[in-house]
Design a protein with these regions (language model features):
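Conserved catalytic loops of ABC-family nucleotide-binding domains
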Residues: 70-84, 90
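Conserved "ABC signature" C-loop
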Residues: 1-21, 46, 63, 118-121
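C-terminal boundary and immediately downstream tail of ABC-type ATPase nucleotide-binding domains
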Residues: 7, 114-156
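ABC ATPase nucleotide-binding domain "signature" region
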Residues: 30-31, 37-42, 82
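Conserved hydrophobic alpha-helix in the ABC-type ATPase nucleotide-binding domain
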Residues: 66-68
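H-loop (His-switch) and adjacent beta-strand-loop-beta switch element
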Residues: 93-110
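Catalytic Walker B motif of ABC-type/P-loop ATPase nucleotide-binding domains
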Residues: 50-54
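A short, proline-enriched helix->beta-strand linker immediately N-terminal to the Walker B motif
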Residues: 44-48, 77
Length: 157
């Protein structure tokens, strides 16, 4: 699982390798290292539903994309609910939930772009901020995405 979260190389370089103590009495991990270690630990315990709250927030984009691709492979037979403020991965999701003020709009990334002007605005702003406007292809799996800044329509709870 360390390889899946792109942490195996760094662990191999640690003086004690896999036996390295981290935290109290051990070495201090960076935010990205700690986040990847936590995700690896989570992946060790296979569950049919996995809920991840911004699991890539401390990762650089290249590492995030690699970890996300590996995560999709490892969880292809399950459901992943990914909460994130970074929308560029959402075109790869089978289902996107956009929430705001107690209202939920569900659909594919393209459907949410059409239904929710605020989602479209935020997505375009983020896509433009890194110079990339590429949309990733839709791929199979029951992965779902829910954005923290979220937007309206359809259901009210």
């Amino acid at each position: 699982y360390l390889k899946a979260v792109c942490f195996d190389g760094e662990v191999a370089e640690m003086e004690e390798g896999m036996d390295t103590i981290v935290g109290n009495g051990g070495i201090r991990l960076s935010g990205g290292q700690a986040q990847r270690l936590a995700l690896a630990r989570t992946l060790c315990h296979k569950r049919p539903v996995l809920i991840l709250d911004d699991p890539f927030s401390a990762l650089d984009r290249k590492t995030e994309e690699e970890v996300f691709a590996n995560l999709r492979k490892l969880t292809a037979d399950g459901i992943v609910i990914l909460l994130s403020h970074r929308l560029y991965l959402f075109p790869q999701m089978n289902q996107v939930l956009w929430m705001e003020d107690g209202k939920v709009t569900a659909g594919t990334h393209e459907q949410i772009l059409e239904k929710c002007p605020e989602y479209a605005r935020l997505y375009e702003a983020q896509a433009g901020s890194d110079g990339s406007r590429e949309h990733a292809p839709q791929t199979p799996g029951d992965h779902k995405a829910a954005d923290k800044e979220e937007k309206p329509e359809e259901r009210r709870d």
